[in-house]
Amino acid sequence: MINNRICILGTGAWATALGSRLSLNGNTVFLWGIDNNEVNDINSGYNKKYFGNTKFSSSLSATTDLKTAIGDSKYIIFAIPSTALDSVLDKVKEFLSDKKSQVILINVVKGIDAETSQILSNKIKSKLGSHYYSRLVTLCGPSFATEVFEEKPTVINGTGKNLKIVKQVCELFNSDVFKVIPINDIVGLQVFSSLKNLLAIAVGLSQAEYTSVNTMSAILTMGIEEIQKIACKMKAKKWTIMSFCGIGDIFLTCSSTQSRNYSFGQDLLKKGVEKTIKENKKTVEGFEVYKTAKNIITKYNINAPIFSSIIEVLEGKLDPKEFSKKCLELFWNQKINK
């Protein structure tokens, strides 16, 4: 097993879980963050904010100094909130000029760029150039950070322009409990990974109202159809929906209280929009992406009533208590599929 030096940008749950997995695979892992408490915690063998008093089963190092974190790393992983990607790319760019022949970039950030409505790999390309885009791999799939950290069996997908590099990254992560499977759809993987979070808010809200698997299944069915419409308009491949990054990730995010987006949706009914947003302390990707989703739906003139309705809730235009009633009307108006 080769010992690679790996830099992970981020000290959150996902960054720490992936760092732990890579360290267990025999690599040297450095995490970079801006929170001194989290950095110190990681250096003492814990990340109590996300994993309580569970000690790491392998060694991780963390620092607030970006130059130290990157060092001579062979791999740089972006594991930060999507809202921070712009500024972090600008900082990282300074340290990449002499690494053109070797460094491989890995993106696990979820979202669609708010300004351009483009997938995040295109943002990375615009910031860092075509050379690094050709050495970029994006990972996504059904994977709660806590379960990856606890070494529960997990399967996700990886995609990128260079299939050889994609396979190399897959092997970097693969173990007897964690598997990354290559997929040839850069657009689809990222669109599904982003929009499923908004659907999870919708499902969580409806579940808070009805506590019904029947209702959840109906909203999921219609929501998945809408995601597929949007993805195809953005040039995703039709079959990607059946992959781990498609239906697998959608099911995970839309069916469990472990999902921040699902829980956020439940809180909308209990507390209302304003209070839920004010009290929320975690990254809720579905909330971050709803304006972008609205722009895409408008741009391509897509009929997406479930998405349009949950967007109205988040905009404060539709009472959360009216959302489920609106969904019921949509169910009753469904036409026979031909």
UniProtKB/Swiss-Prot annotation:
GO biological process terms, semicolon-separated: carbohydrate metabolic process; glycerol-3-phosphate biosynthetic process; glycerol-3-phosphate catabolic process; glycerophospholipid metabolic process; phospholipid biosynthetic process
GO CC, alphabetical: cytosol
Catalytic activity, reaction form: sn-glycerol 3-phosphate + NAD(+) = dihydroxyacetone phosphate + NADH + H(+); sn-glycerol 3-phosphate + NADP(+) = dihydroxyacetone phosphate + NADPH + H(+)
Main subcellular localisation: cytoplasm
Keyword annotations from UniProtKB, A to Z: Cytoplasm, Lipid biosynthesis, Lipid metabolism, NAD, NADP, Nucleotide-binding, Oxidoreductase, Phospholipid biosynthesis, Phospholipid metabolism
Record: residues binding NADPH: W14, Y50, K110, A145, R260, E285
InterPro entries: 6-PGluconate_DH-like_C_sf, 6PGD_dom2, G3P_DH_NAD-dep, G3P_DH_NAD-dep_C, G3P_DH_NAD-dep_N, NAD(P)-bd_dom_sf
Residues engaged in binding sn-glycerol 3-phosphate: K110, G141, S143, K196, D249, S259, R260, N261
Keyword Transcription regulation: no
Top EC category: oxidoreductase
Active site positions: K196 (proton acceptor)
Keyword set includes Lipid biosynthesis: yes
PROSITE patterns (alphabetical): NAD_G3PDH
GO molecular function, one term: glycerol-3-phosphate dehydrogenase [NAD(P)+] activity
Pathway assignment: Membrane lipid metabolism; glycerophospholipid metabolism
One Pfam family this sequence matches: NAD_Gly3P_dh_C
Compartment list: Cytoplasm
Superkingdom of origin organism: Bacteria
Entry EC number(s): 1.1.1.94
Cystine pairs: none
Classification via PANTHER family: GLYCEROL-3-PHOSPHATE DEHYDROGENASE, GLYCEROL-3-PHOSPHATE DEHYDROGENASE [NAD(+)] 2, CHLOROPLASTIC
Family of the protein in this entry: Belongs to the NAD-dependent glycerol-3-phosphate dehydrogenase family.
Function comment: Catalyzes the reduction of the glycolytic intermediate dihydroxyacetone phosphate (DHAP) to sn-glycerol 3-phosphate (G3P), the key precursor for phospholipid synthesis.
Protein name, as recorded: Glycerol-3-phosphate dehydrogenase [NAD(P)+]
Source organism phylogeny: Bacteria, Bacillati, Mycoplasmatota, Mycoplasmoidales, Mycoplasmoidaceae
